[in-house]
Amino acid sequence: MSELSSLFIKMAEKWQAKWAEARVYEPEPRPGAAKFFVTAAYPYPNGAIHIGHGRTYLIADVLARFHRHMGRVVLFPMGFHYTGTPILTIAEAIASGDATVIEEYMAIYGVPKDEIEKMGNPLYLARYFHEQSKRAMQKFGLGIDWTREFTTIDPEYQRFIQWQFEKLRERGLIVRGRHPVGWCPRHSMPVGAHDTKDDKEPEIGQWTLIYFADGEGLVFPAATLRPETVLGVTNMWINPDAEYAVIEHNGRKMVVSKDAAFRLSFQGDVRILREARGREFVGRSVQNPVTGEWVPVYEAKFVDPKVGTGVVMSVPAHAPYDYAALRDLNAVRLIPLIRVEGYGDYPAKEVVERMGIKSQTDPALEEATREVYSAEYTKGVMREDVVGRVGAHLSEPARSMLRAVFKMYFAGRPVREAREFISKWLVEAGIGGVMYDIMNKPVYCRCGTEIVVKVLEDQWFINYGEGRWKELARKLVEEMAIVPPEAKAHFLATIDWLDKRACARTRGLGTPLPWSDGWVIESLSDSTIYMAFYTVIKRIRQFGIKPEQLIKEFWDYVFLGVGTPEEVAKRTGVPPEQLKAIREEFDFWYPLDSRNSGKDLIPNHLTFFIFNHVAIFPREKWPRQIVANGWVLREGEKMSKSKRNVLPLDKAVDMYGPDPLRATLAITAEVEQDLDFRHAEAIRNAQQLMSIYSLAQRLAQTAEDRSPNWLDKWLVSEIALVLERAREAYEKVRVRQAAVEVLYNAKSVFDQYLASVERPSKLAVEAARAWAVAMEPIAPHLAEEIWSILGGEGLVVKAPWPQLRPDPVALLAKRYVDMVIDDVKRIPAFGEGVKRVVIYVNPNYAWVKAALSGDVKAVINAGAPPQAAKRVVDIVKTLGDELRGLISAVGKFDEAEALASYKNYMEKALGAPMEIYNADDPSAPDLGSKKKVALPLRPGIYIEK
């Protein structure tokens, strides 16, 4: 802990105590008042929260604090997610003596050895990190209402979740059946993103299997994502060095890689008959089940036994890897299948040659493959003549009948339609099948086991594939605010592909499924509408309502308004006035105004949040906004336990102090961007905050009570502009932009002001107090300290947003004065030995107003000589939008008065005495004939040496 961080920590402790004493963050509903209800994703207490969590929570906290300044009643609560396997997996690892996990927890999280020994108990581990994370949030200065805190294994919460699931079941959205799921072979249970290392969502894809067979009936099931190309197969590929197995699967003897046999065993009965190296099968001939053609099996070391079945069909006309490999073997035979605009008959050959690819090991083949596959899928059409290749091995009339089917549904069709047709037809014809796989492999369970796909027979699912439900979800996405806006497309895409999702398992902490013993609701399914629970748990506890009283009728009334307090009281035993109070509390806070989380939760939690809200709640209670922030890196690298570069939030607060840490997480990247947290940047921000503190102390000690001058008015006007830009940034959730305005741009204005005046005025103190309010969402402890030393009443956290108004005359005067200073400095005669600077001002400001139109005649009509009129128009054209806007807003402007008011400021900037004259004053001396060249905004300047 440095001296600087120690100062900020002590400052924070002081003001956090005062906030707690004033119960600032424990709001009560105020009927009729505007409100702002924000939540951020509650953490799993399977470890200490880190600066990545801190960033998400900071953004929510910044919004909460800003909206409080805007006069709204603000609620920002927090809970803890005990459900699922993350906690259980770590506890099991510690209990089994896993040295790696134990060492990580001691080194990264600073857990003492005597505490580690107790963490084999999952609830002890969860409570330990629950309390540690809560302390970290408090030290970080998050304005959380802890009176609403809960865990997801609290009995009240479990009753709430059971009600939610009964509602989904009533609406036909929970089903039981057969479906592929991500699966941990070790724990024998479905897994989702929160059950995996690095929270990686298992992406389940489907291979089409095409059953090529040799003369002995041994099937070689080629796994492909492009079954429409089966008509162009010229050979098969097998890795000669890989381990393969002959298996019995679905009544067939098949050759697949040993790894594929293991994966297939979770999708049907698999019996391994024998194992062999791939080279045993090289050189055989197998028959294409669609064309009847016999093709050879070649060896290829590029075949990955962990992908598909380890058996690959080769289509060199349309697959760059196949073309390059066969070219190396001098065995190329091309069969054209797909017409693509901009390509010839053989797209793979064309692209390989265009890119100068020389061999099958060239890395550029990856790019070539992407180009060909994308072009064929998006623009490709199946050739009409492919029909002639179908069923050559069949006798009549079967051959003609099959070709007629292909002519109708395959030939001349877009590739995507042909693919859909042939995928179904192969299975229906019994010459193909389906294999599911993890397409973003490897994905590992938190226990370290690689995830596979299992087809479950009697699993409970939430049916996110239901069409009407998807439409409601899309409607909400289109209506609500999403930050960043470009994430809206990601949500819509997720809604499109979401299908049935396993919602219960037989292992882990959590809520029992209410209608089926032995099942526990999984962690991404019990965390979709808990924001509503925050609004009622405080009263449930306050009134002493028991979990067994929280029956269906209670929740129906509180959340949906079903029934009357009197009717529900009879069923629950809860007094009517208490029921009414709880209902009113929910009604005041809901809908949720902002849901904050990391962008990695868009494909799961955040989209489930949307689905479940539209399923459970009426439209007026649907959430209004989602904020999905980017990740946090550390010194350019992803944080991970294996790299030992995870920075726990409480440790970061101790290293830098809460406000410097908040400033760094706010200012380093805009919300949607990934943030690279760097030590040097955090130190720089700490020093910037310290300089702001020193500036405020100087103001408090030196400000004098005097009539405001032009510089004072300019300061207030500039700060008013900074605050307005900050307000707009906060409103739009542009947290970095707001932080730049309040921590750097405002400081720069004050620095310039203090460098230009002998002593600051009381008006400057008022401006600094306004600045403290705008700074408070980012650096609340420093803002309180500044507010206090500058005489602010009460706590700045409760202060209304300042109403400073910019004075356009004061702003124009300062811009004009600085422009004149620059003009003087650009004159070649300016430099060493200047005795005085004489300035001649043209008083015809009306010419400048007229010149805004860009019309020379308008300036002449305002009284300017023609030659001068053209020059004034040219001058005005060079001005920026801001200066033109000020000129438009200011009716009259006296350049001589502005220069005279800033005389001391200008003489200090120029390092020489200055004299000011009106150019039309006949008594003024005409030094260097500069009077006649003076124009509005461009005075005549004489330099005497």
Swiss-Prot record:
Keyword line: Aminoacyl-tRNA synthetase, ATP-binding, Cytoplasm, Ligase, Nucleotide-binding, Protein biosynthesis
PROSITE patterns the record matches: AA_TRNA_LIGASE_I
UniProt GO MF annotations: aminoacyl-tRNA deacylase activity; ATP binding; leucine-tRNA ligase activity
Extent of motif 'HIGH' region: 43-53
Catalyzed chemical reaction(s): tRNA(Leu) + L-leucine + ATP = L-leucyl-tRNA(Leu) + AMP + diphosphate
Residue positions binding ATP: 641
Positions occupied by motif 'KMSKS' region: 638-642
Compartment(s) where it occurs, according to its Swiss-Prot or TrEMBL record: Cytoplasm
ATP-binding among keywords: yes
Chief localisation class: cytoplasm
Domain of life: Archaea
Gene: leuS
Signal peptide coordinates: none
UniProt GO cellular component terms: cytoplasm
Family membership noted in the UniProt record: Belongs to the class-I aminoacyl-tRNA synthetase family.
EC numbers on record: 6.1.1.4
Pfam families listed in its UniProt record: Anticodon_1, tRNA-synt_1, tRNA-synt_1g
InterPro entries noted in UniProt: aa-tRNA-synth_I_CS (IPR001412), aa-tRNA-synth_Ia (IPR002300), Leu-tRNA-lgase_arc (IPR020791), Leu-tRNA-synth_Ia_arc/euk (IPR004493), M/V/L/I-tRNA-synth_anticd-bd (IPR013155), Methionyl/Leucyl_tRNA_Synth (IPR015413), Rossmann-like_a/b/a_fold (IPR014729), tRNAsynth_Ia_anticodon-bd (IPR009080)
GO process terms (BP): leucyl-tRNA aminoacylation
Name of this chain's protein: Leucine--tRNA ligase
PANTHER family on file: LEUCINE--TRNA LIGASE, CYTOPLASMIC, LEUCYL-TRNA SYNTHETASE
